[in-house]
Amino acid sequence: MAVWALGINHHTAPLDLRGRFAFALDQIAPTLHGLRDSLSSASGRHPGVETAIISTCNRTEIYCAAEAPALDHTLDWLAHSGGVSPALLRSHSYSLENGLVARHAFRVASGLDSMVLGEAQILGQMKDAVRAAEGAGALGTTLNQLFQRSFAVAKEVRTSTDIGAHSISMAAAAVRLAGQLFEDLSQIRVLFVGAGEMIELCTTHFAAKNPKQISIANRTLERGEKLAARFGGDVMRLADLPDHLHEYDAVISCTASSLPIIGLGAVERSLKKRRHRPMFMVDLAVPRDIEPEVQQLQDAYLYTVDDLASVVQTAQAHRQAAVAQAEAIIDAGVQSFVHWMELRSPATQNGGVVPLIQQLNSQADEWRALEIARAKKRLAKGEDIETVLEALSRGLTQKMLHGTMAELRAGDAEARAQTAQAVSRLFLRSHSKNGL
């Protein structure tokens, strides 16, 4: 079994390119079906391919497992889905196979590959992705094992190291940037666009500064009302946002919209109504919620997820010792996963151990079924049960030892000597070692 991964993230691709490959959670299942169909139709070698997709603000990654790798076809499929050329995607992506896939997945789950080093949110996002793959019937034994081990390694990293200490979240970074623009955050009005997990985190951090007003704009009022009620805020429909945008000093947006929901014109009109008082805006969505041209307006201070990178990395130096500890834990996890793969892979030098065990069990079951059938026939004829049991046991013994006896007699002297050593080790151990 081969495992491969293809992805883009904040290290390799700019924000606008990442936005082309962002998949909302409810899009994952049909997307996985499309990928599996594509891999299966491209080659008969991939009828049972396993797939999973992780899509967040900072990364989109495809994980696959099949009898043979198909990285090139996976890249072509992803490029087509994002409407870019394979050459462009290749220049901004990374591809990994087997043990390197495990190392990468373990680092991602542990927060070592995040923009916010040590952040815990990615672990929940990975679990959501795995549940989506399971629900789509796209997850098999190999990828399930990979991700379950990823979660176990991440848990050990967080409990055994200080990787999450001193970290500054994206939400906290937004508050810090707002504090650089406004002297007193308790005197500002803040609008949050969306009602997902990231907006909830941002609302929590801003609420701690006791702003003058908190408002939630969301496509559905019910979800927005629940969040607003927690923080004593009010709520509006997303459609009403342009009419009220000028009322807010700070706007934090993170929705799953495929197109910008706050345009240049709306912000220009709002700034005029505000008589050019500054407006602080943070766009945490991928793809963008706020048109990038807004950044050119004199009184609009627009920040994206990539702009927050320098803020969230300020405490990174304090966590280098924890990173080294985490990498050691990950190394051990990778070795364990690779060993698990080798045991199950028929591509190893002497064949996979697990497939061989399965074949031995299958052969033994055939012999057992045959001898039991013979014994039942003899019992039905009225033969003595002691005689039947003796024949059954002798028949099983002969079948189990026939191949071994034949091998001991075959080949040259050197081959017979090697076979004799193996047979002695397997069959002539002491009773205590055999557990008898």
UniProtKB/Swiss-Prot annotation:
Root EC class: oxidoreductase
Biological pathway: Porphyrin-containing compound metabolism; protoporphyrin-IX biosynthesis; 5-aminolevulinate from L-glutamyl-tRNA(Glu): step 1/2
EC number: 1.2.1.70
Example GO BP: protoporphyrinogen IX biosynthetic process from glutamate
UniProt keyword NADP, yes or no: yes
Signal peptide: none
Highest taxon of source: Bacteria
UniProt keyword list: NADP, Oxidoreductase, Porphyrin biosynthesis
Xref: InterPro entries: 4pyrrol_synth_GluRdtase, 4pyrrol_synth_GluRdtase_dimer, 4pyrrol_synth_GluRdtase_N, GluRdtase_CS, GluRdtase_dimer_dom_sf, GluRdtase_N_sf, NAD(P)-bd_dom_sf, Shikm_DH/Glu-tRNA_Rdtase
Active-site residue list: C57
Annotated site, Important for activity, chain positions: H104
Note: During catalysis, the active site Cys acts as a nucleophile attacking the alpha-carbonyl group of tRNA-bound glutamate with the formation of a thioester intermediate between enzyme and glutamate, and the concomitant release of tRNA(Glu). The thioester intermediate is finally reduced by direct hydride transfer from NADPH, to form the product GSA.
The family this protein is said to belong to: Belongs to the glutamyl-tRNA reductase family.
Free-text comment on this protein's domains from its UniProt entry: Possesses an unusual extended V-shaped dimeric structure with each monomer consisting of three distinct domains arranged along a curved 'spinal' alpha-helix. The N-terminal catalytic domain specifically recognizes the glutamate moiety of the substrate. The second domain is the NADPH-binding domain, and the third C-terminal domain is responsible for dimerization.
Subunit structure, interactors included: Homodimer.
Protein name: Glutamyl-tRNA reductase
